[in-house]
Amino acid sequence: MPSLFSNQVVVITGAGRGIGAAAARIFAHEGAQVVVNDLSAEPAAETVDAIRNAGGDAIAFPGSVTEPTFAEQLLQAAVDAYGKINVLVNNAGYTWDGMLHKMSDEQWQAILDVHLTAPFRLVRAAAPHMREVAKAEIAAHGQPLEPRCIVNVSSTSGLHGNIGQINYAAGKMGIVGVTKTIAKEWGAFGIRCNAVAFGYIDTRLTQAKEKGETIDVNGQAVALGIPSAALGDDKTRFIPLQRAGSPAEAAGGIILMASPYASYITGHTLEVTGGSGI
């Protein structure tokens, strides 16, 4: 029985850790050739090593998705290595929290750059490899010859807002509008586009800030996580399943929306939340 993504090429950003790494491993397990991007070379290489050690096929292409010309470089690397692109997953991101009245322009713009501008650039750069290829297939054969889709990562912070995250909320709600627009513009070429909005998932973005995880933003170390005082003693009391989700469970939402089982789903935002927000 063929795997879900046999003979498909998947490009996934932010895949060195957490949800992205879990998704990359599942895609590879299901037969995909995977292009692993991460800001840092070492975690990207670790994901590729894990895939290869399990018998899968992957390459790493590290770098910042916020660099203006990086999108074209990443997607060209995928085509050079594997000849095509079937799935693009816009997963890269981080948080840089602050209350509205204290947030700097730099904080605001940095988060919009990674969560909104970078996905826009990546999808635009994918057009020659996805939209135009599908268009040519339709002209020659009457229909696309291969499945193609885009999955954008959103958040319940975008859908519902979140205290201290006005920049992140704006970016994650903005990507929902981007998703719907892509679905409408590229649907005629058989290309689907969906979003997956995560709730409380156990990653370094939701761990205690006191653990000291950081990300480099223009030479500045930005602390990741949530202050222990804000986390409180019972972080799951508003989640019907009464627990956080794992990176693999979150990745399952990405896999589902990219899979043949979602072939008639486009423009949709799937909430992976353990039931929070219902």
Language model regions located:
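Canonical Rossmann dinucleotide-binding motif of NAD(H)/NADP(H)-dependent dehydrogenases/reductases
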Residues: S3-V35
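C-terminal substrate-recognition "lid" of short-chain dehydrogenase/reductases
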Residues: Y82, R243-V272, G277
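Substrate-binding pocket helix/loop in short-chain dehydrogenase/reductase
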Residues: M99-L100, S104-L112, K235
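Active-site helix of classical SDR
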Residues: V123, G171, T179
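Alpha-helical segment proximal to the catalytic Tyr-Lys
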Residues: P128, K184-E185, S263
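Residue(s) in the substrate-gating loop at a strand-loop-helix junction
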Residues: S155
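Short, small/polar-rich loop/turn modules that mediate ligand/substrate recognition or access, typified
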Residues: G187, R192, I265-G267
